[in-house]
Amino acid sequence: MAGLAVCGHSAQACRLALVLALDVSNSVDADEDALQRNGLATALLAPAVRDAFFASDAPVALAVFEWSGRHHQRMMQDWVLIDTPATLEIVADKIATTPRFYYEFPTAIGYALGLSAGLLDTAPQCDAQTIDVSGDGVNNDGFEPRDAFLAFDLEGVTINGLVIEVPEDAALWAGQIDLTTYYLENVIQGPGAFIEVARGFDDFARAMEIKLVRELGVLMLGQNTLLAVGQDG
C-alpha cells in the first residue's frame, strides 16, 4: 500500500513495540470476526487512541496478525512505525479490509505467543515491548501459554489480554475455569500486565480502545480492567 513503510532494526528509536494478535479460531464466526476487525480499526482511529499514539515525540511500532491453530497464523500488518496520523489511518484501513485467512482451526495461544516473540526479535529498537492477545477461548491446541514463557525469550515483555466473554459460550465451559481467570493465571505476564474484558464481540471496539490507550500510556474511565496477580492498580 503506497505510503506505508515497513520498519526494521534500522528504523528510528520508538517508545513501544506493540504486537496485536487477533483470535480467528473456529469459535469465531464470520460476523464476530467482522466485529473484531472493524472494532480494531475503529479503536485505532478513536480520538483518544490517536492522541495517545502521538502524545510523545517518540513513535510506536505496530505489528498485527491473526491466529488460530498451532500452525495457523498470518500477518495482517508487518512492523510499521506509527509516526503520522496518515500512517495510522492506512493501517486501520488495511486491518478492516484484510480478508480472514483461517476459519476451521482450534485455539493455540502458546503458538501465538511464540510468533509474537519472533516478531519482537525483528522489531525496531524500542523502550518497551508489549504483546496484546485477544481471544474468546482457552488454549486447546499445542503447548500452553505458560510453556511459551519458558520456550521463548519473553523476559521483560508485557503480555496483556483482551478477553471476549461470549454469554452463550459460558454454558459450554460450565464447571471449568472461566475465561477471564484463565487469562489472568495463564496468559498475561510482565511489567504492568493487565486484562481488558469485552462483553461479547459487539463490545470489542470499546474494550480495544480502552486497552490501547492504557498500553500507550494513558488511563481511561469506564474500563473493565484486571491486573495480573500481585500488581496494584
Where are these regions (language model features)?
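Von Willebrand factor
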Residues: 14-78, 82, 86-134, 161-171, ...
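C-terminal "exit" segments of structured domains
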Residues: 196-233
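Second-shell loop/turn segments in exported
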Residues: 21-31, 62, 78, 95-106, ...
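Extracytoplasmic/secreted envelope proteins and their assembly/folding machinery
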Residues: 33-37, 41, 45, 61, ...
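Surface-exposed patches in mature extracellular/periplasmic domains of secreted proteins
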Residues: 47-56, 106, 124-129, 220-224
